[in-house]
């Protein structure tokens, strides 16, 4: 009687396990041949979870033992059911795919914000270097991971949505592939990529606000932003001042009526042609300031300037321009 399986070379067969829609197992060898029970020739098996054994459904012969079933515990009969029941898949975000973890902060301060002494500071610098070296090998990977860590820090500090960080990482990757980062600081280029990403996602943040949370200067970030615009051929939409209103109102806890009035003011200003060439954050702050005065909320211009990330002078100038062009009569506090 001939064996139903390929001749053995003395080594245990390596079998690939497939599961059909009825829950039965079929075994396939490395050469692609269907494995059959050596006793009865059957090609369907079941898995004994208690013993870790693959057993023939006809004669009960154990064909594989001490085996871990790495497949799912659920059954599915269609591809749609498999997709619904599967609990694994590709990384949900680029940050996860890059295996980002916590990092040692660059500010050299303890948990209470106190400056570290010189001995401890030198130790932290050394640990920070080794942490970076241990995680990646090539200079490309090290640079990208540093940028990803910087963007994650900015996201945590500024409360920026993850989609913006994802977009910023993609922009930075393109800049890295074109060698635009060479000779420039990672912090400045990452901040510029984030500024661009926020505008592309229609969730803009003022450049001055972004600069407050990074080590790079405003001039460096602005220069890197212009470089990205020029070299990557990215079309960045002109920032709509109304996109800044909800965030300003949220920070100052303003009512929905104030928000509605501020949006109406900006729409009228846009029709009048007085918004072109103006800082959108400053226009939004001035519009919200006017709207709050109209609704009896007499806060200072400084409050709105801080919330919008602009100066008091900007709010004052935009306020005067809007009030004059739209003939709005409100008292100035």
From Swiss-Prot:
Binding sites annotated in the UniProt record for Zn(2+): 37, 40, 56, 59
Listed CDD domains: CYCLIN_TFIIB_archaea_like_rpt1, CYCLIN_TFIIB_archaea_like_rpt2
Keywords, in A-Z order: Metal-binding, Repeat, Transcription, Transcription regulation, Zinc, Zinc-finger
TFIIB-type ZnF: 33-64
Pfam family, one: TFIIB
PROSITE patterns hit by this protein: TFIIB, ZF_TFIIB
Gene Ontology, cellular component aspect: transcription preinitiation complex
Family annotation (SUPFAM superfamilies): Cyclin-like, Zinc beta-ribbon
Sequence repeats: 149-232, 243-324
GO MF terms, alphabetically ordered: DNA-binding transcription factor activity; TBP-class protein binding; zinc ion binding
An example Gene Ontology biological process: transcription preinitiation complex assembly
InterPro entries found in the cross-reference section: Cyclin-like_dom, Cyclin-like_sf, TFIIB, TFIIB_arc, TFIIB_CS, TFIIB_cyclin, Znf_TFIIB
PANTHER family: TRANSCRIPTION INITIATION FACTOR IIB, TRANSCRIPTION INITIATION FACTOR IIB-RELATED
Function as written in the Swiss-Prot or TrEMBL entry: Stabilizes TBP binding to an archaeal box-A promoter. Also responsible for recruiting RNA polymerase II to the pre-initiation complex (DNA-TBP-TFIIB).
NCBIfam families: PRK00423.1
Family the entry assigns: Belongs to the TFIIB family.
Protein name, as recorded: Transcription initiation factor IIB
Biological source species: Pyrobaculum neutrophilum (strain DSM 2338 / JCM 9278 / NBRC 100436 / V24Sta)
């Amino acid at each position: 009687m001939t064996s139903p399986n390929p001749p053995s070379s003395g080594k245990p067969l390596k079998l690939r396990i497939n599961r059909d829609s009825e829950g039965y197992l079929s075994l396939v060898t490395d050469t692609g041949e269907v494995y059959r029970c050596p006793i009865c020739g059957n090609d369907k098996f079941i898995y004994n979870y208690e013993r870790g054994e693959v057993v023939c459904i006809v004669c009960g012969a154990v064909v594989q033992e001490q085996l871990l079933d790495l497949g799912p515990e659920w059954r599915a009969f269609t591809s749609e059911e498999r997709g619904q029941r599967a609990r694994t898949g590709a990384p949900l975000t680029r940050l996860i795919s890059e295996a980002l973890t916590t990092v040692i902060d660059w500010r050299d301060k303890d948990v209470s914000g106190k400056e570290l002494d010189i001995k401890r500071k030198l130790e932290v610098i050394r640990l920070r270097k080794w942490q970076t070296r241990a995680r990646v090998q090539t200079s490309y990977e090290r640079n990208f991971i540093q940028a990803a860590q910087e963007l994650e820090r900015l996201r945590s500090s500024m409360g920026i949505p993850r989609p913006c960080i994802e977009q910023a990482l993609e922009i930075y990757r393109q800049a890295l592939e074109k060698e635009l980062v060479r000779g420039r600081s990672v912090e400045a280029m990452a901040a510029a990529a984030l500024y661009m990403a926020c505008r592309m996602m229609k969730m803009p943040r003022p450049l001055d606000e972004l600069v407050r949370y990074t080590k790079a200067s405003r001039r460096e970030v602005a220069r890197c932003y212009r470089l990205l615009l020029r070299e990557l051929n990215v079309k960045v939409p002109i920032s709509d001042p109304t996109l800044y209103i909800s965030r300003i109102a949220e920070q100052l806890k303003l009512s929905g009526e104030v928000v509605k009035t501020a949006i109406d003011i900006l729409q009228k200003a846009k029709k009048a042609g007085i918004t072109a060439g103006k800082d959108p954050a400053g226009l939004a702050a001035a519009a919200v300031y006017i709207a709050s005065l109209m609704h009896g909320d007499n806060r200072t211009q400084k409050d709105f300037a801080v919330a919008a990330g602009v100066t008091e002078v900007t709010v004052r100038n935009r306020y005067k321009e809007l009030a004059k062009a739209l003939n709005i009569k409100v008292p100035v506090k």
